[in-house]
Regions:
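Conserved active-site beta-strand-loop modules that form the wall/rim of enzyme catalytic pockets
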Residues: 107
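A short His-aromatic
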Residues: 116-118
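Nucleotide-sugar donor-binding/catalytic module of glycosyltransferases
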Residues: 113
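Class I (Rossmann-like) S-adenosyl-L-methionine-dependent methyltransferase catalytic domain
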Residues: 1-104, 121-132, 136-204
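A conserved beta-strand element that flanks and buttresses the S-adenosyl-L-methionine
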Residues: 110
Length: 204
């Protein structure tokens, strides 16, 4: 297994990522139902949020619908997807989350189906970025496995790993506490991928 994110960076920034963006209109209502559930688990609605790997902006759009006044920012590696995401908020940075430097913090920092595409060796950097970008909440919605487990993705290797992402972060950062967690199913009335989600909260 290659241990650098370089190959993945090139794939997601290039045609592979362009193709993904074309497949990503998504079910708007299902996304709104998902994020309504996430927000309900928080002690208060966040006033700002940053998404790493925001794609075409589906998740940011759902948050904007539910919280019209929320300040939003996204980081997206694929330029074609980022251009579409700017229809939701102009604050979209083109680049990998692994090189993102948090200048300001946001009440909510999150990923949804993104950490699974980062090689396990690079996850500590991704966790650090999420942690530093968050002022209060971190949400991860990813494919879970007790340890990093590679899965073939669209006929490709070195592109997807299930893992214990939230647990890794809880072990790494002692001021993070598990606020809530759950599962969404592809067979729900408002279906998503079969994803586990966790909400972590920074506490003194």
């Amino acid at each position: 297994m290659r241990t650098s994110h370089g190959m993945q960076h090139l794939e997601w920034a290039g045609q592979f990522g362009n193709d993904y963006a074309k497949r990503s209109p998504g079910d708007v209502q299902a996304n709104e139902v998902f994020f309504a559930r996430i927000l309900a688990a928080m002690n208060a609605d966040p006033i700002s949020a940053i998404e790493f790997g925001c794609g075409v902006g589906n998740n940011l759009r759902a948050l904007r619908t539910l919280l019209p006044d929320i300040a939003l920012r996204g980081v997206e590696i694929n330029e074609s997807a980022a251009i579409l995401a700017r229809q939701v908020t102009p604050l979209i940075t083109i680049g990998s989350m692994l090189v993102h430097e948090a200048i300001i913090s946001w009440e909510l920092a999150f990923t949804k189906g993104v950490l699974i595409h980062i090689p396990p060796v690079d996850l500590p950097r991704a966790y650090e970025v999420l942690y530093r970008a968050s002022r209060k909440y971190i949400m991860v919605a990813e494919y879970y496995a007790p340890k990093p487990t590679e899965i073939e993705y669209r006929g490709r290797r070195d592109m997807l790993w299930k893992g214990p992402h939230a647990y890794d972060m809880l072990d790494r950062y002692q001021d993070l506490k598990l606020l809530d967690y759950g599962f969404v199913s592809s067979r729900d009335p408002y279906p998503q991928d079969d994803l586990n989600w966790w909400i972590l909260e920074k506490r003194p």
